[in-house]
Every structure is written in C-alpha cells, then in structure tokens.
Amino acid sequence: MGDTAKPYFVKRTKDRGTMDDDDFRRGHPQQDYLIIDDHAKGHGSKMEKGLQKKKITPGNYGNTPRKGPCAVSSNPYAFKNPIYSQPAWMNDSHKDQSKRWLSDEHTGNSDNWREFKPGPRIPVINRQRKDSFQENEDGYRWQDTRGCRTVRRLFHKDLTSLETTSEMEAGSPENKKQRSRPRKPRKTRNEENEQDGDLEGPVIDESVLSTKELLGLQQAEERLKRDCIDRLKRRPRNYPTAKYTCRLCDVLIESIAFAHKHIKEKRHKKNIKEKQEEELLTTLPPPTPSQINAVGIAIDKVVQEFGLHNENLEQRLEIKRIMENVFQHKLPDCSLRLYGSSCSRLGFKNSDVNIDIQFPAIMSQPDVLLLVQECLKNSDSFIDVDADFHARVPVVVCREKQSGLLCKVSAGNENACLTTKHLTALGKLEPKLVPLVIAFRYWAKLCSIDRPEEGGLPPYVFALMAIFFLQQRKEPLLPVYLGSWIEGFSLSKLGNFNLQDIEKDVVIWEHTDSAAGDTGITKEEAPRETPIKRGQVSLILDVKHQPSVPVGQLWVELLRFYALEFNLADLVISIRVKELVSRELKDWPKKRIAIEDPYSVKRNVARTLNSQPVFEYILHCLRTTYKYFALPHKITKSSLLKPLNAITCISEHSKEVINHHPDVQTKDDKLKNSVLAQGPGATSSAANTCKVQPLTLKETAESFGSPPKEEMGNEHISVHPENSDCIQADVNSDDYKGDKVYHPETGRKNEKEKVGRKGKHLLTVDQKRGEHVVCGSTRNNESESTLDLEGFQNPTAKECEGLATLDNKADLDGESTEGTEELEDSLNHFTHSVQGQTSEMIPSDEEEEDDEEEEEEEEPRLTINQREDEDGMANEDELDNTYTGSGDEDALSEEDDELGEAAKYEDVKECGKHVERALLVELNKISLKEENVCEEKNSPVDQSDFFYEFSKLIFTKGKSPTVVCSLCKREGHLKKDCPEDFKRIQLEPLPPLTPKFLNILDQVCIQCYKDFSPTIIEDQAREHIRQNLESFIRQDFPGTKLSLFGSSKNGFGFKQSDLDVCMTINGLETAEGLDCVRTIEELARVLRKHSGLRNILPITTAKVPIVKFFHLRSGLEVDISLYNTLALHNTRLLSAYSAIDPRVKYLCYTMKVFTKMCDIGDASRGSLSSYAYTLMVLYFLQQRNPPVIPVLQEIYKGEKKPEIFVDGWNIYFFDQIDELPTYWSECGKNTESVGQLWLGLLRFYTEEFDFKEHVISIRRKSLLTTFKKQWTSKYIVIEDPFDLNHNLGAGLSRKMTNFIMKAFINGRRVFGIPVKGFPKDYPSKMEYFFDPDVLTEGELAPNDRCCRICGKIGHFMKDCPMRRKVRRRRDQEDALNQRYPENKEKRSKEDKEIHNKYTEREVSTKEDKPIQCTPQKAKPMRAAADLGREKILRPPVEKWKRQDDKDLREKRCFICGREGHIKKECPQFKGSSGSLSSKYMTQGKASAKRTQQES
C-alpha cells in the first residue's frame, strides 16, 4: 500500500474502539485503510496482492480416517478453542502430541499463566463480533473488502466535532506507537481528554509560509471544504501530525496530498453520494395546491377501489354471527369479537377476518382453541380448517365458504383487541386517518413490505406509523396521551405508565409506582403493584385547535417524514408520548425500525423486519415515493402533438459530438422514435433550440428557491420554462445505455458506462463557456454526457456553488500531480460512485450490525448482482435487478485494477454529468417558478391535468424486497423451507445389524459405565465429606442439615464429578422468611475458617444462590445451595429409576459420554444439562414397546393418586421398587440388549419423536403437546418431572439445537452402520464410536448465548466483571503513563499482549510451526505465513502479574487453588495420560479451552 496507508487517523469517539498495528497491516492491498473493532486484533494479516484471505483452522483434531488427516469443520464458530484434547481412546502418538500441545498452555502456575510460547500465530476469524471494549451499539465499523469482517455504517448528519481526540489510522512512527492501545471506558477517556487537552500552537504555522504558498494553501483548503474536509482548530495531543479531518468519514489526515487520496476512495465517495441524495430530497419544495388535489384524487381512487365500506363490514359481522352459532354448543360461556381491520376499517376488502374468543378463567387457551378447531372441522359453513399453534399468537385458520374470506380465530388476544379499539375510535373521530392509512398500507402492499413472514412489517404497524406522524407534525392533527401535564411524568418513568382502555372517546391511563422504571415492564409482569394514579385524555384535539389539511398534503408530508426527517435507526415510533423515545430507554437494540404497540409496550412489533437489505429496500421505496409525489406530474396535449421536438434541445457542438461517434448517432435516431411510444406523459414545447440562461446555481437558488426536479418510474415531467428557448427533453435513456462519449481535447473515450434504466431520461444542453464552466475542460470546448436521474444524485444549489471557480487548466492526463489533485478535488465536489451497472461482482458495502442484547444471528454477506453487457446495450424491456443487496446501487469496484482505464478518467466522465445535473436544477427551478409565463408562450395547460397514480414500478423502480427466512435470518427462502430445520434433513436408511456388531455395541455401552462410574470407596468418601462439613457448619449455624443430591446420589454420577449439597435448617421447612443472600454470604465467611477448603466463592446472583469451594483432600469441587429441596426429590426419583434395570445406568452413562465428547452437555454454555439428557433416556425407555421402565408417577396403590407437596408441587412417585412387578404388568417384557436400546434411542430422537409438537415428559405415558404446555416457541422441550413450569430446554438457541440434532444424526449413522473391522487409525473401538470429528463434523458447539470474554451465559460482554477489571487496570496504568511518555512504546506492547490473552487463539506445535486443519485439505505453509505475522510476545512485568492475579479472582482453579485457569484446564486434573476416565474428564472439547481463549 505504501504511502496510501499513511495519511489517516481514526477518530476515537465514544462509539468506536481503537486499533493496533496489525489492523493496518492486514487486508486488501488496494484498500487504503480499514476500521475494525478491537476484538479482531491479531486476527488479520497483510496479504500478498491477489491472495484471497481464507479462514484457517488452528487446532489438532488428530487423524480422522473418514475425513483424512487434520480434518475439522468449516464452521466459523469452530475456531474458538486454544486447545483440543484427544478422545479418551488414543495411541501413544496421539498422547505424545497432545502432551506437547498442552505443555505451553497449561502450566498451572499463577506466575506465568500469561506467558505464551513465542512462535508464529495464525490469525483466525472466529465469528462476527462487536468490539470487546465497545458498549454502544451504533459504533461505526467498516468492511474489509475481502470479507474479513463486515458491518454496516449508518450515515448520520450530526458529525462529531473537529476537536474530538482521535486515533491515527496510519502515519508517523510516533503515532504508530500509540495505536495499539486498547480502548478505554468512556468515563476514563473523557477524563483523560480533559487532562491531555490539545497541544499548544497552530495546526499549520502560516507565519513561515510565503504569500504565494499561503494563497495556494487557502485555495486548496477551500476545495477540500467542498468535500467536507476541514483544517483542525487545534492539534490533538495524541496525534500531533494530523492537520485535517473529514467530517463525513470521521478520520484525521496529515496533508493535502493524502486528503486528495482520501477523496478518491469509495468510502468517501459513498458518503458524499448519501449526503447529496439526502440534501436533494430535503430541498424539494412543498407541493402546490394543484398537486395536493391531484394526490388526493389518487388516494381517493385507492380508497374507493380497495378500502372497506359499510357493506364489507356487515359481511364480516355476519361471518362472526355464523361462527358464534357453530361454537354455541361446545363453548357456551365464550363470546366472539372482531378485531383488526374488520373492525377499524383500516384495511382492504380482501383482508383477513380476525376473530377473538373471550373465555372464562377456568378454561385455558389451548383447550379453547382445540375445541374451536374441532367445531370448525365439523361445520359446513367453513372450509380449509387448519391450525397454527406455533405462532406467537396461536390461531385456527379457516375460510368462510360463501364469501371466500380467510378467517383467523384466536383466544384471549386482549392487547390486539385494545389496539383495535383505539384505532377504530381514532378512525371515526379523525376522518383523514382512514384514507391516509389505507393509502399507506396499499403502498406497502405494492412494495411487498407488508409480509412479516417474509421479513417485512405487520400490516397494522402502518396505521401506528400514520398516527405517529399526525402527532409529530408541527401542527399536530392528533394528540398524545402521556406528557408533562401529568404530575410526576418523565420519559425515564415511561415504563410506569400504561394505557388501559378507551371509553367514550377518551384514553384511560394508569400509573404504577414501580421501582424498576423500565419501559419494558408491563402491568401483567408486576401484578403486586397497586395503581396509585389513573387519568384520562381525549383521543382527538379540540376542533378549534385542529388545522384543516388535505389528505394529499398529509400523504406527501408523511412520506417526507419517514424518508428524511425521522431517525428510524435510533428512535422508537411510540404514539403514547410527544417526546422522542430512544431505543436505549426501551433497551431495544439499534436495528432497523422500532415500533411500540401502545397496549403491548414490551416488544418491538417491527421485529419481523430482521434483515438489513429489506430495511434498505423500505428506505429506498420511501424516498422514491416521496420524490414522485413531491414533484409535479402533468398530462399535456403538447406531448401528443409534438413529441419529436424533445430532441431539438441539443447544441451544435453537441451534435458534432454525437455525430462523431456512429453508435451515438444510431442511438439518437432510436431516441427520436422512442418518444412516440412514451404516451401522454412525454411532453415538450414548440421551440427548436435551447439556450441556458447564464445564471450561476447560487443565483438561481436565490432567485427561485426551488429544488431540482427529477423523473422517476414511467412518469414524465413536463417542464414549462420561462421562455421558448428553454424546453424539456423527455426521452428514454434505455436507448442510450452503453454510449461512449468522445472528448476531443483528450482524444480518449470514456469507458463504457451503463447509465440508464427504464424510466430515466436524457437531457442534453448547450454548455457554453461563460454560462457554466465544464469541469476540467478548456476554452471553447463543450462536451455532452448522459444524465443519471435514478440515484437522486443531483447536487443542491449549495453544493454547486463552487462550480464556476474551477481551474480550467487542470491537467486531465494526471501527469502533473498538483494539477491532478486540484482537478480531482474539484470534481469530487460532485463525484459519486460509478453507476451500479458495473461489470464486476462487487462485495456489498454494508452488512447487518451485530447485536449483543438479543440472540445473535449470523447473516450472510450480501452482494449486488451486477450485470455485464459486452455491447454496452441493456435489454430495453428489462427492469432493474431484484433488490438483493446493500442498497448501494452505485458501488465502486473494490480494487483499482478492476476499474482499469475507466478509473483514470472517471473524474472527467463524472464532470459532464454533474454540469448537466446543475443545468437541470436551473431548468426545473425556472419551470416551477414561472408556470404563468409558460402558459402565455405555450399551449395552455389546465392545472387539473396534474396526475398521480399508485404504481409498483414507480414506487420501487423495478426492485423487489429480499425474501428473508425468519428462522435462520438468511435470504432466498421462507421459514417453512428453511434448510436448517433439522426435521427436513433426509436420513439415509440404515442396514440391518449383524449379531457381531450388536455385540460390539453392547460392549461399548458397558465400557462407558465401567470407565466412568464411581467406586464404592468414592461414594463413601463423598458421604464423609458431607458429615465433616455438616459438623463444622453447625458450630456457627446450629440445627444445620446437609444433604447430598444430584449425580452424587442419583446413580448416574461420574468419577470426580462435583459434589452438590443442599443445606436446610431444622424447624424451617422452606426458605420463606430467610434472607438467602445474606445466609450464603455468612456461610462463605464461616467456610473460610476451614483449613481443608480453598477458594470459597459465594455466588449470590444465580437463580439458586450457592457457595462454591474446593475440597483439598479429595480434589472435589463442592456447591452448597440453600433449600433446594425439590432437587432432593428429583434425585430420589432418578435413583429409583436407575435401580429398576441395569440397562438404565448403562444407557445414561453412554449418553453422558456421548454428550461430553460432542460438547453438548454443559448448560452453563448454552446447551443441555446432563440431567436433561438423563430425562431423555428415561423418556425413551418409557416409550419403548414394550417399555423398559414404567412411569413411576402414574403407579399408586389406591384409587386416587397421592399428593405430597413440596414448594407447591406434587412430588409423589412409586418408590417401592421391590413391589414393582405387582403394580406394573409389563415388568421384564423388554429383552433388548443395551446396544440395541442405544441405537434405538438415537433413531427414536432422529426419526420418530417430533420435537416441535411434543414434550419429553417422564411423568406421564401419554403424549404431551408443546401447545398444551404453551411452550411452542422452544426447540427442544423437556419437562421437569416435579416442577411442571420448568422447561430444561428453554435456554437452547436455534444454533445449539441444530448442533445437538446434528450430533444425534451423526451418532445414528456411526452406531447404526455395521463395520467388519475398524480402521487402523483407530486404536480401539471406543475411539471409533466416539470420534468428535465425525459426530460433530469437526465443529465446535456454538456460543451465541455466551459472554464473549468469560464464555458463560447469563450476561453479555459489556457486563462481564472480568472485562471491567481488566479495563480498570488498563485505565489506571494509562493515566499513570500519561506523565511518562517515554514508556508509551513499551506500554502499548504490553497492552496488546494482555488483550491478545483474551481475544486471540494460540496455536503451539513442535518446531514452532502452525498446524492448519481445514475441512477439505491442509493449506500450504506459505499461506499461513502470508496470513499471519509472527508475534513474539514478551513476558509482562511483575507489577502487572500481581494486578492480574488480583483482578481475575473469579477465574480460579478449584484443584490447585491457583488463579488464572479453571479446573478443567489444570494439569493436576488431567491424571495419567493412559487413564481412560481421566482423559474423559478433560472433555477434550470446547468448554475448557474456549473459556481460556475468550477470557
């Protein structure tokens, strides 16, 4: 990159992290710089030109015969772990290699836990993540053009101040020393900025410049200002060489030369284009009364044709009456009510009929809807009856036979009925609302953005958006319902106020004094809160204060409001308050559109819009539609009489230019003929020549104050200028696609450029010197180029002020550096990106932002499908491509060499465009201002000839929204066709099992039990520990009783598994009235006195508060919980099941081994607990035919089931196992071997069991549906046998569910396909069957719910205590070192070392060479060298070690007692290398390793 990378600094604002040296050394050779977040430090690299960056998988997974050596997954999440321990069964070579690998990672010494082995590192892109030190979610991040990390940068008009202390992006060595410093907390940064201030002295010392140099500097800076580049007012202390800043791109620049290079970059051009597009639309004038009237006529037409009328409402009421009669017999106590558009009239004639059933409290919603489904199926009036019980609002769907209308029946949908009641009342009281909403909804329907199942918006939100607009107008038409007139009201307390109902045209609100004060808290969530205040407010404004505004004007204003004025990215659409509600107040992520339902304020009703391309498409449609309705569109008779005169607006020289090139001449002939086909919309005046008045754009703007007028869609604008010399050319630019415009002064042709799409128009005018100076042209030279109206790219008058001051003698060839820079500077005042139809597949600029606060879903990188036409001619009948990408139609190629010669002369080509755009500005302003003159000189035009229509082509420009799956968030398919739905995986049939293979399966299952089950001595030792602890605690807590539960007592425990202890106090049956948190803290204080315990850690924030500690003598980790009595009975139940049949234990141990090897058995990391898998085994054995075990909770001696309540739950089960054959008739009937049962279990959960429809419940034999439990939103549903409200699978994400099911499917194949002999690479059958590279395909379990620092669930990165402590230490040291600048270089290296400890993965192998593992083949070593730079890490200084040891107390080993690692990483925990069980205890997988890496 050379000097290209030097001129920039990156501003460090409150929303952006800092960077280190590697951030600048990596990435695309043609890209000057890149801003990424801190979490990616060390993950990138500098590459050779043309070398494609690829993901590399560090880690040695051993030899997998089925996939070849070093085979791992292609899953990007599989790169998390710094180490991977081999499966339990391995040969000596595996063990030796594993020892070598672990030697550098697990030293078990607190003094050197941060010392990494020097050697090459392989940078790995694990997943798209936010900055580890970035809390604000709207931080700007930029895209690596090779796909390293892509995020979307939102364009904001409010730019940061020039004085903001900033960070160098590249530049002098002094600055490079400081770039590696990680980002500090906002508070500390602000304090540091105050301490540092700015350097004294001017940014540029003008006193040493000569008069000529000073003049040149001033002229150059004037040109830079046009591109939003300004001189800094003061020199930042951190980056003293910075002289300029780009307000658009938020970077610091060292010199004018580097500023010109920045101006030419795609990033800057894109921001300029966005700014100009917005300013163009912003300057459009209000519509004239005639326009408003024409718009109103178009809206009335839509309402009459599609809106609901009285007869339609009567029809829907009749359907409700018919349905009431159908339900009368089986649901006598229920009543029906219409809601939705059938009641509010804010819909269409063919809208669904929404009916809600009100039912008594003794019935449940599932019971009601199941009866509804049954009744409708038996009715003759309704057909096509179906149910969607897995929707957020479960409904029964049917179709009324006579009318054919679709009916959706819900039960207890109270919030929707309240919202409907509100909308209905507003529609009756404010007559303009109904047509406005119907027009808005019809617009959304035409644009295909009202389909939530396809990633669009729910239709009713457009009514809320219209109401919100009417409330936010400068002269509001509707009132808000909460505000400062209410005593004690403030936005921060908005969560305490709720709308309750509508009564007699007033809104009833209620205030509850909630301590939370969170907007998301609703009345239902705080039932114990007592309303302390009620009030009411009118639904509409007083008639005296209500302005009279036509619907047409409201429509144009609404489009402008959402297209330009309202900040959709940061604010919430809430009709409750006048003040703007921020997303932070609602604690909603900053993603796309946020809309609050006034009666269901907790959830964002626009959350179905889950794709950035769809959001960009909606903005595109809003802006396009606003532009269409804001500009005048007329039908004139002259368009029919003199269509060919439109071609006469060409100067003599322009004709020469066209005639000079035969292609242009040919297309000009076509152009003349094409106007005939344009229809009545194409207009022209009678004049044959066109001369532009010699007005500068500034003068024009001052004279007329009107905006440029542009064409869109197929509508054609009729311009009536001041005199007959100025006419409009209405032509179809399809005929000009691909034209080459010849420039005589350079003797060159511009590259082929596809500029037009259907509906765009060409305007050619005489560009004479003295009227408008052509950019870069010489005297007496006029050129003609095409005008692109599609992208809203015309600059405003303000942007065009400097046009007449351009240097005419700039060197077009670029041979003079200074001249070229000046020319490029001038041109870039108007320059945009090359038009979207470039002949290259271009990576998108923007991609979806990551979000920590909600479940993070990976979205695929988007590209714009560009088309290449070799002839330069696009298909005239073809519309735009389907809208598939970032919304950037004018994307530049990422690499300079891809543009070829075109890039060299791009500015010359763009120049002509912008001059013509400037001329169009004048013409339009003249035409809009001087219509009366036009009427005198041209044929009279009746103002009633303004014409508008609702057309999909006009609103969308031929684009269509991207279909996005709501399940996987990927494009191109719907949820019902999602390939990630594991039920859609086609399973291959399994061959019959041979007796020999069955015998092997039996041996494998029994071996698992033998290797992992604890001995009698160990069980006795656990009991001894309990007794010892009990007696010790009783000294301070008299009457204390300790009881073992969990794996220690249920019969399914592993060797060295944790010791779970429940503490109760005699005389207290429950913890009611006991301060559990204080008791746990006191218990921890007492335990610290015990000499045999270490690392006592109270955890009071957990759902069940516990004390964790390490028992020195046994080496066990112990958890003591308080009054976890239900768990004691769960333990008894499992113990009873394990005693019924030995096969139960064998299968449960096999299942636990299987899940540990696949890393799917750790609930703290987002998967299922071993308890949940045990319940899955028991459920399978109960459902087997014949069953292996009974349902103990359904066996009892009397006629009625006994009831024994603990914590409100019946904990009865049949525990007399000796008497079981008497009460269970099928005892002993199942004689299958344990191997058959194990394979049967895998097949049961992959082939038979429907996870979507049924619940895994061991308390009943009959099937239990997820709808009955109302757990339809979960993926795997496992019911606790006693606590029936506890779903053990509630914490699973979709990714983890798919990962678990994939492991089961692969296990079915491995255990279900007989093999005659095991491959030689497998030393034992155990390693063959439990090879994680096969079972999980080499992938690691996803961690989308885990903290990215410590690896645990329950909090996100910004709340991680480990992160806070590290930041606090760094801030203290940074503040200290501010006074000692000579230590900055050393400190920055040490900072980077600490950061890499938590964010970077280390690969250490013998001979210091990285081992690379890829799914297909190993990458060559040279690629690794190219992708990664060796980082020789120095050991940190002693003072940091002591500080780290103090800060990282939460990460401590419960075996050796040392800090800095956890139990599973401790070498003392590994045991001997030859021990099978000890190998298993390492789990060999992600949980231990990822924690170290991410911590």
UniProtKB/Swiss-Prot annotation:
<feature type="zinc finger region" description="Matrin-type">
    <location>
        <begin position="244"/>
        <end position="274"/>
    </location>
</feature>
<dbReference type="InterPro" id="IPR001878">
    <property type="entry name" value="Znf_CCHC"/>
</dbReference>
<dbReference type="GO" id="GO:0005654">
    <property type="term" value="C:nucleoplasm"/>
</dbReference>
<comment type="similarity">
    <text>Belongs to the DNA polymerase type-B-like family.</text>
</comment>
<keyword id="KW-0808">Transferase</keyword>
<feature type="domain" description="PAP-associated 1">
    <location>
        <begin position="551"/>
        <end position="600"/>
    </location>
</feature>
<dbReference type="GO" id="GO:0050265">
    <property type="term" value="F:RNA uridylyltransferase activity"/>
</dbReference>
<dbReference type="GO" id="GO:0008270">
    <property type="term" value="F:zinc ion binding"/>
</dbReference>
<feature type="modified residue" description="Phosphoserine">
    <location>
        <position position="893"/>
    </location>
</feature>
<feature type="compositionally biased region" description="Acidic residues">
    <location>
        <begin position="868"/>
        <end position="880"/>
    </location>
</feature>
<feature type="zinc finger region" description="CCHC-type 1">
    <location>
        <begin position="963"/>
        <end position="980"/>
    </location>
</feature>
<keyword id="KW-0464">Manganese</keyword>
<keyword id="KW-0479">Metal-binding</keyword>
<dbReference type="InterPro" id="IPR045100">
    <property type="entry name" value="TUT4/7_NTP_transf"/>
</dbReference>
<feature type="modified residue" description="Phosphothreonine">
    <location>
        <position position="57"/>
    </location>
</feature>
<feature type="binding site">
    <location>
        <position position="1058"/>
    </location>
    <ligand>
        <name>Mg(2+)</name>
    </ligand>
</feature>
<dbReference type="GO" id="GO:0005737">
    <property type="term" value="C:cytoplasm"/>
</dbReference>
<keyword id="KW-0863">Zinc-finger</keyword>
<feature type="modified residue" description="Phosphothreonine">
    <location>
        <position position="64"/>
    </location>
</feature>
<comment type="subunit">
    <text>Interacts with MOV10; the interaction is RNA-dependent.</text>
</comment>
<keyword id="KW-0597">Phosphoprotein</keyword>
<keyword id="KW-0548">Nucleotidyltransferase</keyword>
<feature type="compositionally biased region" description="Basic and acidic residues">
    <location>
        <begin position="92"/>
        <end position="118"/>
    </location>
</feature>
<feature type="modified residue" description="Phosphoserine">
    <location>
        <position position="844"/>
    </location>
</feature>
<dbReference type="GO" id="GO:0005829">
    <property type="term" value="C:cytosol"/>
</dbReference>
<feature type="compositionally biased region" description="Basic and acidic residues">
    <location>
        <begin position="734"/>
        <end position="756"/>
    </location>
</feature>
<feature type="compositionally biased region" description="Acidic residues">
    <location>
        <begin position="843"/>
        <end position="859"/>
    </location>
</feature>
<dbReference type="Pfam" id="PF22600">
    <property type="entry name" value="MTPAP-like_central"/>
</dbReference>
<feature type="binding site">
    <location>
        <begin position="1057"/>
        <end position="1060"/>
    </location>
    <ligand>
        <name>UTP</name>
    </ligand>
</feature>
<feature type="compositionally biased region" description="Basic and acidic residues">
    <location>
        <begin position="15"/>
        <end position="26"/>
    </location>
</feature>
<feature type="zinc finger region" description="CCHC-type 2">
    <location>
        <begin position="1345"/>
        <end position="1362"/>
    </location>
</feature>
<feature type="region of interest" description="Disordered">
    <location>
        <begin position="43"/>
        <end position="69"/>
    </location>
</feature>
<protein>
    <recommendedName>
        <fullName>Terminal uridylyltransferase 7</fullName>
        <ecNumber>2.7.7.52</ecNumber>
    </recommendedName>
</protein>
<feature type="compositionally biased region" description="Acidic residues">
    <location>
        <begin position="887"/>
        <end position="898"/>
    </location>
</feature>
<dbReference type="GO" id="GO:0031123">
    <property type="term" value="P:RNA 3'-end processing"/>
</dbReference>
<feature type="modified residue" description="Phosphoserine">
    <location>
        <position position="172"/>
    </location>
</feature>
<dbReference type="InterPro" id="IPR054708">
    <property type="entry name" value="MTPAP-like_central"/>
</dbReference>
<feature type="compositionally biased region" description="Basic and acidic residues">
    <location>
        <begin position="1381"/>
        <end position="1410"/>
    </location>
</feature>
<feature type="region of interest" description="Disordered">
    <location>
        <begin position="162"/>
        <end position="205"/>
    </location>
</feature>
<feature type="region of interest" description="Disordered">
    <location>
        <begin position="89"/>
        <end position="140"/>
    </location>
</feature>
<keyword id="KW-0963">Cytoplasm</keyword>
<feature type="compositionally biased region" description="Polar residues">
    <location>
        <begin position="831"/>
        <end position="841"/>
    </location>
</feature>
